[in-house]
Amino acid sequence: MSTDNIKKVLFKPFLFILFLIPLFSVFIGAAEGGPCKDYGECDDFKYSLNDFESLQRGAATYINYCYGCHSLKYSRWGRVAKDLKVPEDIFFENLVFDKSIKPGDLMTGSMPAEESAKWFGVAPPDLTLVSRYKGDDWIYSYLRAYYEDSSKQYGVNNLVYPGTAMPNVLLALQGNQRLVCKDVPIIARNGGQKRDENGITITEEKCGFLEVENGTGKLSKEEFDSLIYDLTNFLVYVGEPAKATRERIGWYVVFYFLIFTALSSLLYREFHKDYNKH
């Protein structure tokens, strides 16, 4: 076999694999977001698993507002405290209300499944892996897409998950959100806004926009969005506690492959020189 053939056999498949690594990561990232139904495109969410303050706030929000119904049965109290860099005694004092719970116990929730099914029509699901099968974009959009709907049992509906059986437990924080109509510019075929002979933008009424009534919530829009960010960030962590470590190691692996490729190329040149001598 000639040296050119050896080069093709050894290096082309290797370079092809290196090309696929970033491409595959793009596909994985795209798969994280799920469809958002009537909401349209899901809002973009960028998790930050090294922001421990965000994760700590998200854990506090989850335990105070969500854990009563939704368990995290694949997580352990002590592991969460350790990963979020909260001293175990402080974590248990402030976030664990059942003093019989131990650090090694699973976060199995406090609501019996049979009773909750009677109350809500369906047992609230465990949310340990919700970020894995729904996507972080979906969670972030869903928690901000509740609106008033008097035709529903709990008086609310959701654009991302129409007909949701879950009440808006964060209503007091967000405020009363409604669907409203707005005048929006008509878009021309060239992508610009249509204007009349006087240069005034032509508009049309469209409905389905979410708007919070002023003064009905404890938090401002920015504060509520920040709270939902922290909560979603925490759920991303819970879905894969080792995710930040995996991604960090992944960069080292890519760097190793690049160095290995460079060294292999230099080694090939040396072998090629010796081959030509003979």
Regions found by a protein language model. Give the residues of each.
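N-terminal secretory signal peptides that target proteins for export/translocation
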Residues: 1-11
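Bacterial N-terminal signal peptides
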Residues: 14-25
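Sec/Tat signal peptide C-region and signal peptidase I cleavage site
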Residues: 26-32
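Electrostatic cytochrome c docking/interface patches
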Residues: 32-60, 71-82, 239-247
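The canonical Cys-X-X-Cys-His
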Residues: 62-73, 231
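Electron-transfer interface patches adjacent to heme c in soluble/periplasmic c-type cytochromes
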Residues: 85-196, 208-224
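Short, aromatic-rich amphipathic segments at membrane interfaces
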Residues: 213-251
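Juxtamembrane interface at the cytosolic side of transmembrane helices
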Residues: 246-251, 255-278
